[in-house]
Amino acid sequence: MKIRQVRALTVTGGGADYHDQAEDHWIDDHVATPMAKYPEYRASRQAFGINVLGTLVVEVEAEDGTVGVGVTTAGEPGAYIVEKHLARFVEGASVTDVEKIWDQMFNATLYYGRKGLVLNAISAVDLALYDLLGKIRQEPVYALLGGPVRDELQCYATTGRPDVAKELGFLGGKMTLQHGPAEGVEGLHANIERLRKMREQVGPDFWLMFDCWMALDVEYATRLAHAAAEYDLKWLEEALIPDDYWGYGELRRRMPSTMLMTTGEHEHTRYGFRLLLEMGRPDIIQPDVNWCGGITELIKISALADAHGAMVVPHGSSVYSYHFVITRHNSPFTEFLMMHPQATEVVPMFSPLLLDEPVPVGGRLRLPETPGFGVRLNPEVELRRPYDHD
């Protein structure tokens, strides 16, 4: 069966661009970032424009009218790339030509792509192709990937309230780091004091982690890690900018051996992860399947990690990563992003954009046998097609 049409759509508000939230959402409340060196951009990530792109939805329609859906953070610029460039490699191809289509999209965009926005767009197309193939074959995507190796997924929560996450049955709670190097010793002490208070609340047998969102340097991250070890910090995540592979290697040497070093949410393709694994030596890599190149590339990234003895715990991405994680032995648990504004309730990550999105109960998540990724676009969400290529 052939593919008839590709459509790139945009939406404003909650969706794949989960930073595009209303004010007072915990996910945007004083988070350390590379921009925190500038005081005017310290209190909010939206202040420097983290939500300017918005959500991109890609629909791939087969000759029989079956539609596959993929999403990412790319908005209108990503829609232009899909409609004006990538669509030519998809339309007219067989629904089973997933690997060939990926290779053509990647190689055709090398001169302006390789990472970032272009890979986000490629990822959305790739995910839509997997969703389409699963629907046509009447199989969930995890069946296309070799089948599950476990009955359910164990989840940790990324949250502003690890204490609530513990009550809800999650493995652990990952907090955003609030203060970076520009805030000096006082900020470092504030980070540790927050960890101390949270450890006091949750007790000894619950994971606590810090997400540093690329905000630190090797020296600060080393000091933070050793100070946090007293309160049994499980891991330090994305301490450095993605391109500092040498710095990650040095940080791994300096960190306490009992603490995990994790990173990779803003890395792309097997080539970037090869550098990261060989030079940075992380314990866990965290590719985002909506950004890193889609399922097609995540398969290769995961194999690389397995050969390097690293775990793969994808960043966010809900069903699009769940269907992968459940098929891999080196992905022993998964992330669940608490998207309730106060992080006090379990709500679907991509709400209101997607319907039928499964959520964990008691910190555990079971995937249904629904074909494809098992989700539908919400007809009440207003989608716009800013470009076409007809």
From Swiss-Prot:
It comes from the Bacteria. The record marks 288 as: Increases basicity of active site His. InterPro entries: Enolase-like_C_sf (IPR036849), Enolase-like_N (IPR029017), Enolase_C-like (IPR029065), L-Rhamnon_dehydrat (IPR023444), Mandel_Rmase/mucon_lact_enz_CS (IPR018110), Mandelate_racemase_C (IPR013342), Mandelate_racemase_N_dom (IPR013341), RHMD-like (IPR046945). The active site is at residue 315. The record marks 335 as: Transition state stabilizer. Keywords: Lyase, Magnesium, Metal-binding. Binds 1 Mg(2+) ion per subunit. One of its GO terms (molecular function) is L-rhamnonate dehydratase activity. Coiled coil: none annotated. CDD domains: MR_like_2. It catalyses: L-rhamnonate = 2-dehydro-3-deoxy-L-rhamnonate + H2O. Gene3D superfamilies: Enolase-like C-terminal domain (3.20.20.120), Enolase-like, N-terminal domain (3.30.390.10). Mg(2+) binds at residues 211, 237, 265. Pfam families: MR_MLE_C, MR_MLE_N. Substrate binds at residues 19, 45, 335. GO terms for biological process: amino acid catabolic process; carbohydrate catabolic process. It is an enzyme of class 4 (lyase). Its EC number is 4.2.1.90. Reaction proceeds via a syn dehydration. Catalyzes the dehydration of L-rhamnonate to 2-keto-3-deoxy-L-rhamnonate (KDR). This is L-rhamnonate dehydratase.
